């Protein structure tokens, strides 16, 4: 069996450590202890790394398209590697959740997230596993775009690092147990 873990974000150094790139940050945290390195694949428009966990091939992906076109890379990789959408996990930011809160879901709408909208449009289903990481709402008077493209302040970064550790544990549990339901029971709350 093959699984694909996708972290959403925007490419380029100016977007590193921004709220919208928390999906990239989560994937980077996941691969840190697995001795996985990323290679840029221009054909698939993604940074791709892989390893085996319990005899199962796991692809870690960071699309190099901008957020709104994430579905291009996801669809191309699912097709090329013949991976079912049931074996897809997407990690992304959610501004409707408090900073650092995480929630695993089995399926659902895009909830206004353009990266998820793109994935749903390109793969033709809402039925794929996901991890949402809360980045909070913009402060009064700040636009959503400025909020998601802004960096975390020091206190929020501490909270996000704790959340990234929790996401790391949740994804590893998910890969061991091979069950989103069990993982949701263990980590949602």
Curated annotation (Swiss-Prot):
Gene Ontology molecular function terms on file: peptidyl-tRNA hydrolase activity; tRNA binding
Gene Ontology CC terms: cytoplasm
Protein's GO biological process: protein quality control for misfolded or incompletely synthesized proteins; rescue of stalled ribosome
UniProt-annotated site: Discriminates between blocked and unblocked aminoacyl-tRNA, residues: 10
Active site: 20 (proton acceptor)
Entry keyword Hydrolase: yes
InterPro entries: Pept_tRNA_hydro (IPR001328), Pept_tRNA_hydro_CS (IPR018171), Pept_tRNA_hydro_sf (IPR036416)
Site (Stabilizes the basic form of H active site to accept a proton): 93
Oligomeric form and interacting partners: Monomer.
Protein name, entry field: Peptidyl-tRNA hydrolase
Organism (species): Streptococcus equi subsp. equi (strain 4047)
